[in-house]
């Protein structure tokens, strides 16, 4: 193993949103797992504008004597991936591990991720074994993974699992990307030379419900489409051409049928004509909506507003170390 592959410090980044029930156990289990490491470590918990007592619990944990915890408090809810990027800005380790706060992926897998990363991988992903989710979410996740693999060329089986390890140069490359719509696993793989995956346990959620509502899942789907590729825009031209050709063919067919069967038949085909017309109009609106989604995201990027606003960072000693590293 080369010197450049050795890991000197590990940073754990965990986004938190209304997880007050799971936080005590999360902190306890994550700290216990990190104590098994041979490297120094820090645990950065990012409160993504929680409306419960999550921020207070994180602040108290960060203020404990000899605490390895840094609490990053955002002023409002920005979303999971923006919260993780806020945590990335605070890390001082050369291996960064992301983890969800719901404990569906066990923190006890952290030492194994570190061990695999030491083999020289830039990104270590995970695949959830015996996934404890609904059939709808499993099916949607499988379709998304297939789409991502085709677009990126990176054959990874579970892009939706956020228990992942990244080398520091990968995180720094992601921080230099300023687009607001970000899906971190995909973005990381665009910079990674060597990637791998390991299988991890997946448990049922013990506390609360998933924070991804239907609308958030739809927004995530749009993020995936627009951050992956511009192929849908090219497909619009292809679909438009097919619709135009179909419309022309149908028009010729209707004229021929009218000449053969007479005007009485044409009167009977009005409703068919309207049905086809509505289909074409619907396809146009779908295309306009997709085009508008791209334009809207370009508009957000051009405004160059920050992805998030950090209200407070708690954990004085760790924060000072981070500032020294950044200098």
UniProtKB/Swiss-Prot annotation:
GO terms for biological process: 4-amino-4-deoxy-alpha-L-arabinopyranosyl undecaprenyl phosphate biosynthetic process; lipid A biosynthetic process; lipopolysaccharide biosynthetic process; response to antibiotic. It catalyses: UDP-4-deoxy-4-formamido-beta-L-arabinose + di-trans,octa-cis-undecaprenyl phosphate = 4-deoxy-4-formamido-alpha-L-arabinopyranosyl di-trans,octa-cis-undecaprenyl phosphate + UDP. It is an enzyme of class 2 (transferase). Keywords: Antibiotic resistance, Cell inner membrane, Cell membrane, Glycosyltransferase, Lipid A biosynthesis, Lipid biosynthesis, Lipid metabolism, Lipopolysaccharide biosynthesis, Membrane, Transferase, Transmembrane, Transmembrane helix. GO terms for molecular function: phosphotransferase activity, for other substituted phosphate groups; undecaprenyl-phosphate 4-deoxy-4-formamido-L-arabinose transferase activity. The keyword Glycosyltransferase applies. The chain crosses the membrane at residues 236-256, 270-290. Signal peptide: none annotated. It comes from the Bacteria. The keyword rRNA-binding does not apply. GO terms for cellular component: plasma membrane. It is a multi-pass membrane protein. It is found in: Cell inner membrane. Its EC number is 2.4.2.53. NCBIfam families: PRK10714.1. Belongs to the glycosyltransferase 2 family. This is Undecaprenyl-phosphate 4-deoxy-4-formamido-L-arabinose transferase. The gene is arnC.
